[in-house]
Amino acid sequence: MSPIALNLLQSTPYQVGGSLAANHPSYSQREADRELLAQLRAGKFCYVFNCRQMGKSSLRVRAMHQLQQDGVVCVSIDITSLGTEADPQKWYNGIITQLYLGLPLAGKVALKPWLREREQLSPIQKLREFVETIILQTIGDRQIVIFIDEIDKVLSLPFSLDDFFSYIRFCYNQRADDHEYNRLSFALFGVATPSDLIDNKTQTPFNIGQAIALTGFTLTEALPLSAGLPVDEVSAREILGEILAWTGGQPFLTQKVCELVAEALQKGDLDCQSQTIATTIAQLIEEKIIRHWESNDEPVHFRTIGDRLLKDQARSGQLLGLYQEILHKGAIPADDSVEQTVLRLTGLVVKVKGQLRPYNPIYQAIFNAQWVSKELNKLRPYGTNLQAWINSNYQDSSRLLRGEALREALAWASSKNLSGVDYRYLNASQNQEQEASLAANQILTQANVKAKRMISFGIVVLMMSLGGSAIALSQAYFATLKQQRSQQGTELQRLGTSAQRQFTFDQIPGLVTALEAGNQLHHLVKADETLSQYPATSPLVSLQQILSQIAEKNVLTGHRDGVTSVAISSHKNLIASASRDGTVHLWTPQGEFLREFTGHTGSIYRVDFSPNGKIFATAGQDQTVKIWDLDGNLLQTLKGHQDSVYSVSFSPDGEILASTSRDRTVRLWHWRSGKTLAVLGGHTKSVDDAQFSPDGQTLVSVCRDGQIRLWDLDGNLIRQFGLPEVAFFGVNWHPNGNLLAVAADDGTVRLWTPQGEIKATLSGHDEFVTRVVFTPDGKQLFSSSSNGSVIHWSTSGKMLKKYQGYPEAIFGLALASNGALLAIGAENNLVKVWDMSPKSDLVNLNLPAVLGAVAENAKTNTIALAMENEPLILFNTKNRSRQFLSDASQNLDRLKFSADGQWLLGQRGRQWQLWQLQTKSQLLKTWRTDISRVYDVDLRTTPTSPQWAIAMATGSGEVQLWQGTKNNQTSGNQSQGVPIELNDPIVLALGNSIQRKEPIRSVSLHPTLPQLAAGDEQGNLTLWNFDGTLIRSIVAHGDRLNQLQYSPNGKYLLSAGREGTAKIWSVEGQLLHTLKSDPLPIDQIAISPDSQWIATAASDGMVRLWDQQGNLRGEFTSTSGSLLGLDFNRQGQWLLAVAQNGDLQSWPVTPEKERLRQLVEQGCDWLRDYLATEKQPAQTYSLEFCQPTGN
């Protein structure tokens, strides 16, 4: 080794761990460096979220250094230094202190006196004032960037930081009102996801920020590291390439391996000859890193990854299962789901070209399949039995759990997210246990009836003979009944919970279980019992949830081998299924078997109806295409292919037939004469599908060689495009002919234009996609996969719903011409029929953007919907019409209807707008306030009164009460109420210069009295008169008071807190009832128009119905998670909820037993076709109560 090389190594040592200095010679610049600098220079809010030891801190140091050289003022806040035990006041003071120390403010302000003088302010107000009056005013006209490192540490704080992240969003929104804010930018760094950091999705800054992707080093980016290798430049580059092949460019590992290689080269322990470099580096990595990795893990790296993977016991099973699947398959499609995102944050896997793969071979070697199995078995209480069941190909029922072991396993699993095989095992165990449970319950019911007869008889006899002992005997009698009811309730509760889990993987059996439990519960309870008195509630909840989501309508049995294809005719919606057993079965849409068609030798791979639905064609393994009529007559056999025929398709006029084959050709036939019109060659592998365009002028073929070819009807190639690295299995034309949906073996569906441009890539399947089909209106599509999943997509590429649970590959997928019937054929010999008609209780509003604010009004059946960069929509829930308010500001933060629904108030920042909606929508007034933060608002006005009032709950701890009058101007026969006066607000507040004022979180105006109620951050409830006099202040909740609402009749006040309780108060402030729900915050409340019913919604989407006496009367689960809006309809008969994704869900407001009866009836009605269809024993259920005589 030359002295020059040695000196170079000594002057540029590698740094393993920690942040690199801005001018460190081994710093390798990546694309993230360039993007972060460009975005920050443009004044954007940026965030860099990635796993540990990926170079985030080094990136921050480098970016700060370069910006400072440009004259930008930079400051870095390290969240770790603030600790995790501080209260909000101390934490925010710590932020202000770090800003003071890090910025050139020394001598400009005395910080400690400044903080003391503002003790009465809330923490976020104090931070805002410091930024606005000290930082922006003191630091001239220079740009300021605030870097915040280790932001994930805030997750350990005992209080919410929604306000902090909302403030970042405020700073960017404030630019429209105050140009000084254009100089201020933020950059966040950490190991987290945006959804981890802020609960309030309407106030998140991350949807206006720029995510900076931080990837591993490429060879070009890593070249500065080669300077430290004591060899010539060519050898150094080659060695670096081998190192990156092992590390995947992971910065920490790359530095560590470079250091090991450099040391070995210095000592002469490494042969750098070109032909041996790969082998010697592999040996070095095996010896120094992989072997005995626990002792070699210095600085700690691998243990950090393992700890992050295993630390959350509720989620670790799911993460391990997902990682196990990636190890087994090599890669799976990336869908950016929560579990995939969390797994990526461990650092174990990386997203590459739409695929989730192991990050590098070193991780694969350390965290290998054996390590995963070992950790999974540590987690699972049933690991041994599960493995034995898997080894038996899922057949050994003796390995399934029973009794107490099953209950313990379900209890353990209830709080965890597990892998698919776990749920499959528990589901199979539950199915087996269910049969025994139902039989036992029937025996218990019969015994109960017998016991009642015997005890009643005994009471009569003994009362006659014992006299005074009758009371004791009566008590024993009722105690016996109570015990039996409790036992039945316990079992029914378990069955109801089991039904929901079972439904996830097998829809009809899940519904059957819920029906069995619901029917038994219906007979067990009395009409006058409230839900809180029920011995079990899960049957009712599970029935509601299942019936709002179920799609599976019927299961058609009879094939003796896997189903390869299904088709639905335009004539009577008849269903044809083709199978490897060499037959086609024909069914009615209700599931009645019509006939079997035989004639092929070997498997049948495809079936397709003619456009008029009167005939169909089949493609066979025997190299033939056959044409049949519906009566079973063979009309034609087409011969010419030299290998198996994989698909057949009729032209729109029904005269031409296209077939594809394993012989690498497509043939066009005049099927009536049997004549071959053209043979389309050029494919280099099997051709799996071909389809005519809607106008019949073009044929598209897709091939396993990754090519898509367009042909005219004369057989001439029009165009060819594709992706040579993938194989295509299916294709479908958009109804207007402007798009092609193509199913691929990489788990994606791609949407191409006929010109060869990819418009969207739909990722979500875990294995290759087999079929794809557009809905008739072209707005949506369905795809199926070899792993047994079906996904419902929007044409824009959004995944609407993923259906899982099929144990085998799905090769058949067909949609009826009305879009309401979906047929699915799978390798398990079954055809499943789904009803895709929209559920009456669940409507997707198909909104063009993310919802930001929602307001509902019962009187007018109207929902106001505000979105990002879209007009305000008024949606009528009765007739489902839409009205657009084009004069509304976009990106509204808040909306509020008046109680009569004739007025609508909107807010964005400091700007307010008021509309009158009586006849036609009219923007009446736009004004601005000096309020920087409003948490809640209420609006009161009536057609009979000229007075109106607006109350605003502010972050400064005040309520601002605005009042005005309407000037009734007559124009023709139409009276218009226009507010012409806006009085200065009355400011209502508790506290003084010594007592700190907490932010007001909620406010409500009494419907008739000049009175309002307000709730603050600490759970205090305060009542005021409109003249500003205080009525009463009460400690109402133990935490933030989230919601307040006076009843429409004005007789009571409803409050809801973050600690999960709601309370009913008199208008004088006396506590009447406490509604106990759960520990989760209550985000939404509603009161029916007649004030008889109350609804609350928790942050997890659980909606509860109460009466005004505080009795729990119903529980409903939102299928879309947390809600943005909740209200009753005008008649108070339905409860309506709006979710973030635009789903509108409704539930009936009826007494419990009647609702349960209706649900059982609805479930039986759903299964009518299924129960009437002859089934194999495994799919047979009696459900005698679903028969007409049992109702």
Curated annotation (Swiss-Prot):
Keywords: Repeat, WD repeat. It comes from the Bacteria. WD repeats lie at residues 558-588, 599-629, 640-670, 682-712, 723-753, 764-794, 805-835, 995-1025, 1036-1066, 1077-1107, 1118-1148. Gene3D superfamilies: P-loop containing nucleotide triphosphate hydrolases, YVTN repeat-like/Quinoprotein amine dehydrogenase. This is Uncharacterized WD repeat-containing protein slr0143. PROSITE patterns: WD_REPEATS_1, WD_REPEATS_2, WD_REPEATS_REGION. The keyword Repeat applies. The lineage of its organism: Bacteria, Bacillati, Cyanobacteriota, Cyanophyceae, Synechococcales.
